Design a protein with these regions (language model features):
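N-terminal Sec-pathway targeting helices
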Residues: 1-13
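Glycine-rich, small/hydroxylated-residue low-complexity segments
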Residues: 7-8, 18-217
């Protein structure tokens, strides 16, 4: 009897998890489209430093995760950043559906979440110098977690890189917010082994650089 009851509970939990996973999966694409619309509406109001358009492509929805590309197009370029009109920054995005994203479960985290995502910078004409500086490794990778209540957390991993006379080791930054509007944003981070080489005999070094800040918007 106990064994049958336990089996019934397991089956019920599996059904609930499966239903929750399916439902949260249906919310990903509408959420992406709303984020893009809000961003582009802000552009029309002149709230961005550069004339940029956000879009997405190749959306592929599965049961446990959704994959797509997010791209930022500099419509008129950014001369001060040596960015030509039409050049793009592209990100590969892999979203694991809640309420219990697989990766979080594998790390022993059983707190329900709307979604968890991995974001990687794509190597293209505009971003290639960053990959070269990082010795052909991904220069930055982000892991994001979105809670049902609106709070979010992001971990940004930075690869060691060398940009001419300036170099640094690996780094990691975390961003935690109360809601999607970025209010009360808690930022912590650290970059190792910073070097600024003025000449073969003259350089400035720092073992690490640390940030610990609470931003209220």
């Amino acid at each position: 009897m106990i064994r049958k009851s336990a089996t019934g509970v397991i089956v019920a939990l599996a059904v609930i998890w499966g239903g929750g996973t399916w439902y949260t999966g249906t919310q990903i694409q509408p959420g992406v489209e709303k984020f893009i619309k809000d961003f582009n509406d802000a552009k029309k109001k002149g709230e961005h430093a550069y004339d940029m358009t956000l879009s997405y492509q190749n959306f592929d929805k599965g049961f446990f995760n959704s994959r797509f590309q997010m791209q930022m197009t500099f419509d008129n370029g950014a001369p001060d950043l040596n960015i030509k009109p039409g050049q793009k920054v592209v990100f590969d995005v892999d979203v694991e559906h809640g309420p219990l994203p697989i990766t979080m479960l594998m790390h022993g985290n059983v707190i329900p979440a709307l979604a968890a995502a991995k974001v990687n910078l794509v190597n293209n004409e505009l971003t290639q110098p960053l990959f070269i500086a990082a010795k052909n490794k991904s220069p930055v990778e982000a892991t994001l977690r979105f809670a049902f209540g609106g709070s979010f957390s992001t971990t940004l991993d930075v690869a060691p890189a060398e940009y001419g006379k300036f170099s640094f080791g690996e780094g990691q930054f975390t961003f935690n917010g109360d809601d999607s509007s970025l209010s009360n944003l808690d930022i912590e981070g650290k970059v190792e082994d910073i070097v600024l080489q003025f000449s073969p005999m003259n350089k400035v070094t720092a073992k690490s650089f640390t940030i610990d800040s609470l931003t209220r918007l």
